[in-house]
């Protein structure tokens, strides 16, 4: 499951442009499947400045704890607070209701892959 309209990173994050200088990102279906049942998500705070490629949160599953890496540089303008009470949404809808962070871009992002290149990676 690799939607065509998104960009991806080698660290298994997806990126969706909202067209107004912001992007939304989360982890891919491949990542959530590898993690297993997600039980906790730690996200950056609104107003925090992220640097592309740097850790910005964590996802805890029944198998392990994995870092979330910022795929872009910018200021966090929103986080998915619904994941606090329902972290399993990342498992059931990683590209929809399981989104994690919205960022106002201020700089370059990590190298990205289109859907075909990401499918080749996984």
Language model features with spans:
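Residue-level recognition of beta-strand microenvironments
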Residues: 15-18, 62, 79-82
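Short, solvent-exposed beta-edge and connector elements
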Residues: 35-40, 62, 71-73
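Short, Lys/Arg- and Gly-enriched loop/turn segments at beta-strand edges
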Residues: 60-69, 86-89
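Charged, alpha-helix-enriched surfaces in structured cytosolic catalytic cores
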Residues: 71, 85, 113
């Amino acid at each position: 499951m690799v939607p065509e309209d998104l960009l991806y990173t080698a660290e298994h994050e997806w990126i969706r442009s909202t067209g107004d200088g912001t992007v939304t990102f989360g982890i891919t279906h491949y990542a959530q499947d590898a993690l297993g049942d997600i039980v906790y998500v730690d996200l950056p705070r609104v107003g925090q400045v992220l640097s592309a490629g740097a850790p910005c949160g964590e996802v805890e599953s029944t198998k392990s704890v994995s870092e979330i890496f910022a795929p872009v540089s910018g200021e966090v303008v929103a986080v998915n607070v619904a994941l606090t009470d329902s972290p399993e949404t990342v498992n059931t809808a990683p590209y929809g209701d399981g989104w994690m962070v919205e960022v106002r871009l201020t700089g370059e992002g990590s190298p990205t892959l289109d859907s075909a290149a990401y499918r080749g990676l996984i």
